[in-house]
Amino acid sequence: MEEKKRDVLPCIAVCEGDINPRVLTCGDPARAKKISEKLENVKCLAKNREYHTYSGTYKGVPVTVTSHGVGEGGAVIGFESLCRAGAKVIIRVGTCGGMQKEVTAGSLVIVKAACREDGVTEKMLPLSYPAVADMEVVRAL
């Protein structure tokens, strides 16, 4: 029986079905590499531009780690491709800005909702559509 040829997704350079359902993303490819070093049985799936993708297991759970570069444009392209490749839960880790003085530099922040003033998502959804995290994922974190 002949194996069906799978198309490589543009930008992230992996095929549909290559990505684990749980994905950690970050902007910096070096940070993605560092995170991947915490995984067991890790393998590099692809390195294409700012998208460096690794898969392995963490405490027996399959996890993929990928970078998406700087800015919302690269993140959106990466997230859409990750979903096509099999991602079901995407958690973005890394740095962010803040507006509350009591949240100091270096604080761990688990975001439940965000303002959508990025310049990209309004092209995909009305601004009235809320950017709210899945509460089951938030509770698990």
Question: Where are each of the predicted segments found?
Answer:
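Metabolite-binding pocket within alpha/beta catalytic cores that recognizes anionic/polar moieties
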Residues: E2-A140
